[in-house]
Amino acid sequence: MYFDIYSPPLTILEACDSGNSLASCITSLADKSESSITNIYHHDSSLSNGAGDNSYRYAGGDYQVTEKSMLSGFKYVLSAKSSSDGVINMYCNGLKVYDSTCSSTKYYTLQYDSTSKQYLTYKEALEVSITDGYVTKDNVKNFVCFGSDASICPEDNLYRIIGVFDGKVKLIKWDYANGNLLGTNGDYASSSSTDGYLQYDGFQTTIYNYYWNNKLETATNTWSLSELNTINLNTNFLNNIGTTWANKIATTTWKVGGNTEANIKDVLPATTYLNEITNPVITNTTDNATTYSAKIGLMYVSDYGFAASPSAWTTTLSKYDGNDANRTSIRTINWMYMGFSEWTISPDSSTDIRTVFNLHTDGNLYYGSVNDGYGSRPVFYLKSSVLYAGGSGTKDSPITLVV
């Protein structure tokens, strides 16, 4: 007697055929496989510390240490300032650091390399550690090529799937959007070199900063008045990606009321979600609105919170610059972390009408003034009719869409 041994699908390519709904392909992969394989978590009522909204969300870090690394005594991708149990060491001005920025000379070494060879970028150190078998990549396979049908997807057209919500796939731009997409009018502020950002893992040498809302007479945390919203995201971005691709994006009711620091920053992601999405407030907004209808928005704070591995979901967002219960740096197990300060869509209603939550370079959640300049990554929902064409979801083989 013979029995077939079921092998769960590893990627969307194994779980779905071209021409099927992208949303159903993702949920099918999650249901047919295991979260430990796919890094997709179904946030139903049985998921511990989850959102409880029946969404399917990707969570975890892109890079993980291998068995070879563990046997060598390296339990983490990054070493802490005073330890040697990580694969990669970071240095600023000749001193070993565990920071996110460096205004002086920076370099990286590999703990297992007795020659202490220096690498100029975090990306280069990662690539060598992967080649040498100490680190694996592509552990979260949620890359999508959007805005291009080229055989090799341009890096500026790479987006990532946050999850599936009410039958719609939610995307965020992988790297920060620059002037070619958002323009230099509206709430454009300045540009910054990426040289000083120790864990920046993108492809750009310069990142454009945008105000959240800098218009003199309406510089408040009211999203409907923001030119980052009305001009840079919902005019320039849509025009620059072209009609074909803009037509694949659904008009969405965004939750823009926000909440207090105590209710967003100083609580676990599940509570952040309730206070940001389910029960937002209108305190300190000027239009008394908790929703706004448009195609393009920015990430929610809770999106970022749940993008980390579940081991981090018992940590408050105010401590996402630290470690989870396993002593692993949370920013190394959160695929959404890119190493540069950036805006969320959610106002901070704690103090006045000028503050909004933002992600800091260290992976922590802070608040900033609406006339501060930070990076921006467009976020949007695809229409439920958008179809899967191919690809496994890795950076080199991103999911492609039927055009």
Where are these regions (language model features)?
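Long, domain-scale functional regions
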Residues: 1-403
